[in-house]
Amino acid sequence: MKYIFSITFIILGFTFFSQCKGLSKKCIKTIGDGYMHTGQTSALELSEGKKFQFVAIFYEGQNYRISSCSDILLGDLQLTVRNLNRQLFYDNHGNGSTSYDFKVSNTQKLIISLIAPKKESNNNLASSEDIIGCVTAIVGVRL
């Protein structure tokens, strides 16, 4: 019985990882003309109201675009960019934008956060903890 549960868990894990990897590939295609993917990509499964963060390095004098994508089930993500001192550089909350373009004046690490919106609960629907989807953030540099 333990063997069956172990195999099932492994198969489901690979399935979810593959779905998020597929979303990342789609998001890379939408980064836009004039930008090249830097290889700094992060993807994860996220439930409503939860936050995902990762740190990326940005180099002096370069123009960058950070693009976010999510499963349709999760809706529009909130994208924030902060420095390591937690000073806010960008927040798309309320404007519906899925990308942020900027130029870096000095080489630095920035914290990129993706926050899945929390939807109003309806007694007829499953709880928000039951809704899980993939999110990804792609970093591109202007050519």
Language-model features: where?
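Bacterial Sec-dependent N-terminal signal peptides
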Residues: 1-24
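Short charge-dense sequence patches
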Residues: 2, 27-33, 57-64
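Local beta-strand/beta-hairpin segments that build beta-sheet-rich folds
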Residues: 33, 38, 87-91
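C-terminal edge strands of extracellular/lumenal beta-sandwich accessory domains
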Residues: 20-35, 115-143
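Acidic, Ser/Thr/Pro-rich low-complexity intrinsically disordered segments
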Residues: 20, 45-122, 141-143
